[in-house]
């Protein structure tokens, strides 16, 4: 009933002896103004691209970062554009311009002809009346064992 042994496998290779080990992250900007951190890995690969996390990663433009501010405490997102308090009036204007009159439901000109309607399954449909009566009388006679 023995289980397999568990090992702690590090995410990144152990640092070489010649490289100084630093606990803090050192950040620098390249020619394009992109931030790189020394602790992010080899060859300047960003940390979020190097590690195999779920989800897609994308970078925000400076305009997008400026337009959206995230409230860390509540976890809510606030947009830089002011909230329009008159959204109901705008909605009513939009709906009145589209419709022009109140919507009362679907309108039908005529009912469809029976030939256009789909056929119901055979076990839903009753047998023709003549055959049905004969079958019913036979079943009743056999059940009651009465001779006619």
UniProtKB/Swiss-Prot annotation:
One Pfam family hit: PNRC
Region span, Disordered: 1-69
Intervals of motif SH3-binding: 109-115
GO cellular component terms given for this protein: nucleus; P-body
UniProt keyword list: Activator, Cytoplasm, Nonsense-mediated mRNA decay, Nucleus, Transcription, Transcription regulation
Subcellular location: Nucleus; Cytoplasm, P-body
Main location: nucleus
InterPro entries linked: PNRC-like_rgn, PNRC1/2
Annotated protein name in UniProt: Proline-rich nuclear receptor coactivator 2
Recorded family membership: Belongs to the PNRC family. PNRC2 subfamily.
């Amino acid at each position: 009933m023995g289980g397999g042994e568990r090992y702690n496998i590090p995410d990144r290779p152990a640092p070489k002896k010649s490289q100084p080990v630093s606990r803090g992250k050192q950040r620098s900007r390249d020619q394009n103004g992109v931030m790189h951190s020394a602790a992010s890995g080899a060859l300047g690969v960003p940390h979020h691209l190097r590690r195999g996390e779920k989800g897609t990663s994308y970078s925000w433009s400076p305009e997008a970062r400026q337009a959206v501010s995230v409230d860390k405490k509540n976890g809510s997102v606030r947009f830089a554009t002011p909230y329009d308090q008159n959204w109901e009036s705008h909605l009513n204007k939009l709906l009145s311009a589209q419709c022009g009159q109140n919507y009362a439901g679907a309108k039908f000109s005529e009912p469809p002809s029976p030939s256009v309607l789909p056929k119901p399954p055979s076990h839903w449909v009753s047998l023709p009346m003549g055959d049905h009566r004969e079958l019913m009388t036979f079943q009743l006679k056999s059940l009651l064992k009465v001779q006619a």
